[in-house]
Each structure stands twice: as C-alpha cells, then as structure tokens.
Regions:
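Surface-exposed acidic/polar loop and edge beta-strand patches at domain peripheries
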Residues: 1-134
C-alpha cells in the first residue's frame, strides 16, 4: 500500500493498493493538483472542522454565551463543516513525516469563523507494518 498525504487540508490524496492481479489502483476520489482542490468545494480526502455537519442559524450557546458564526450554507443561514474557510482549506503544519507516519497539526485561533477559544488539532496518519491498514 502507498499513501499520499498533503498538508493542504490534512488531506488523503491517494491510496494505491494492488488489485487481485497485482496492479496498483488508486482507491481515493479526488484530483491531480492542489489547484483543483482549491477550485472545487468538495471535501475529498480532507479533514473537516471545527464542526462536522450543520449548525442551524449559524449560532449556538455555550456556558450561557451565544456565539454567532459565519454562515456558509447558501441562503439557509446555517454553517456547515466548520465554515468557510474550514480545516479543509488550511495549511497544516507537518510535525513528522517518515516512511510509515505523518503527523500534522493546526491551530484554529479564537474567533475563527466565529468559534470561541483556541483549538489545537493533531492528526496522525500511520501505515500498519503489514501495509494493510491506515
């Protein structure tokens, strides 16, 4: 198995696995260039956040404080998948990259898309020793 990761959105770009005849095939849906990922709004292979799903009316209450977020879900006024730009649109810091492991991190600052507090996210992709698990 061969896996390709980019720090743009902490995204899985490709996973090459052998078919029953030994021919390596890419099993990830995506694009050939970073420019294509930037131009398209699909989250193919990316890390989504701060929130997955929709927050109705782009607001929520936490500890008695109402937070108004930046809506990105068309005319509905909702926020989807952490906003725009979200984690999928950010350049993540590569903290480790070797043969079997890639460790990426991103610091989402207080107020990003309206969300409160700093949030440090660390993501580890690790290929198993038998090359059959990611």
């Amino acid at each position: 198995m061969e896996v390709c990761i980019t720090n743009y959105g902490a995204r899985v770009v490709s996973i090459l696995v052998p078919d029953r005849n030994g021919k390596r095939e890419d099993v990830v849906c995506g694009f050939s260039t970073i420019t294509e990922y930037m131009e398209q709004r699909q989250n193919f292979g990316s890390t989504v956040g701060r929130y997955i799903g929709r927050i109705l009316n782009a607001r929520f209450t936490l500890d008695g404080v109402e937070y108004k977020l930046v809506p990105n879900n068309g005319k509905s006024g909702h926020i989807s998948h952490g906003g725009n730009p979200g984690f999928a649109d950010r350049i993540w810091k590569v903290e480790q990259a070797d043969t079997y492991t890639v460790r990426l991190s991103y610091l989402s600052p207080d107020g990003e898309n309206g969300f409160p507090g700093n949030l440090k996210v660390t993501l580890v992709y690790s290929l198993g020793e038998d090359d059959n698990a990611l």
